[in-house]
Amino acid sequence: MTAVTPDGRKLLRIEARNAQVPIERKPAWIRTRARMGPQYHALKELVRREGLHTVCEEAGCPNIFECWEDREATFLIGGDTCSRNCSFCQISSGRPQPLDRDEPRRVAESVARMGLRYATVTGVTRDDLDDEGAWLYAQTVREIHHAVPGCGVELLTPDFHGRPELLDEVFSARPEVFAHNIETVPRIFKSIRPGFRYERSLDVLRAAHDAGLVTKSNLILGLGETRQEIRAALADLRSAGCDLVTITQYLRPSIRHHPVVRWVEPAEFEELAAEARELGFAGVMSGPLVRSSYRAGRLYRAAIASRTDRRTDGATTQAPQTP
């Protein structure tokens, strides 16, 4: 009998191979404690009352309590189906739905209703569209800036195949932070992210840096990389002009996904954070439960503090007016 996914899709060959490895037992340090303060409760009630949707809740992020207490949240745009298939990601891949051109307005409205100080916007790849979703990403930033003056926006995008005209469209919206995640090291990159290219991802970050944007990326550990390869990838990111970096532990979403090769101990995350700072990153978040959008507003403010002399379009880059 042919194995299928919960939604009825036939397993890909790589998924079938992954499924032969049982789900790994998590170590004791992969724990989070729920601290539900007044801001979290207020935001939770607002989301329930208004019928809003965030990645924070729908993906079961372990950091939701901390981020919501700081009025930070993450939104997913472009639908719930990705046109590429990364072996670590729980988002479904396949033929995406038709583009919803009203989505940017609705996301901005949600940000306003939630009273966010900082919003992260990410999305699926849309290789089915002529512009690969560049307009959608850019317009969402513009709508949030218009609806909620002073709210910082972090935009986490795919690579748009490195097409300069599409990158320029996204850069023109001037997000406070432009993020593009390399996720892993060159040796295993193709097997982990077959629809992407390591050097192309670095080129995207370099282009954003050259456009005067604060840039950010993420590395996931536990996929089969070595410590030396991690250090080299961090150096590659800095050479590309990356300002901020998050370093995270891979947690396997299901038996179909890439197995966890190793559990990285908290002490190693601390060592890697120190190494990243020595390389010159303006902001670093490194830990087993860190995610790429974890405390995104705090990292942005760290970058601004270290780049007060940087000029963008003839004006000093300014942080949004948040506490």
Swiss-Prot record:
EC number: 2.8.1.8
Highest taxon, organism lineage: Bacteria
MF (Gene Ontology): 4 iron, 4 sulfur cluster binding; lipoate synthase activity; metal ion binding
Family, similarity comment: Belongs to the radical SAM superfamily. Lipoyl synthase family.
Binding site for [4Fe-4S] cluster 1: 56, 61, 67, 293
Keywords, alphabetical: 4Fe-4S, Cytoplasm, Iron, Iron-sulfur, Metal-binding, S-adenosyl-L-methionine, Transferase
Entry keyword Iron: yes
Name under which the protein is recorded: Lipoyl synthase
List of residues binding [4Fe-4S] cluster 2: 82, 86, 89
Pathway terms, separated by semicolons: Protein modification; protein lipoylation via endogenous pathway; protein N(6)-(lipoyl)lysine from octanoyl-[acyl-carrier-protein]: step 2/2
Organism: Acidothermus cellulolyticus (strain ATCC 43068 / DSM 8971 / 11B)
Cofactor annotation comment: Binds 2 [4Fe-4S] clusters per subunit. One cluster is coordinated with 3 cysteines and an exchangeable S-adenosyl-L-methionine.
Reactions catalysed: [[Fe-S] cluster scaffold protein carrying a second [4Fe-4S](2+) cluster] + N(6)-octanoyl-L-lysyl-[protein] + 2 oxidized [2Fe-2S]-[ferredoxin] + 2 S-adenosyl-L-methionine + 4 H(+) = [[Fe-S] cluster scaffold protein] + N(6)-[(R)-dihydrolipoyl]-L-lysyl-[protein] + 4 Fe(3+) + 2 hydrogen sulfide + 2 5'-deoxyadenosine + 2 L-methionine + 2 reduced [2Fe-2S]-[ferredoxin]
Subcellular location: Cytoplasm
CDD domains: Radical_SAM
Any one cellular-component term (Gene Ontology): cytoplasm
The protein's required cofactors: [4Fe-4S] cluster
One Pfam family linked to the record: LIAS_N
Domain Radical SAM core, residue spans: 68-282
Alphabetical list of NCBIfam families matching this protein: lipA, PRK05481.1, PRK12928.1
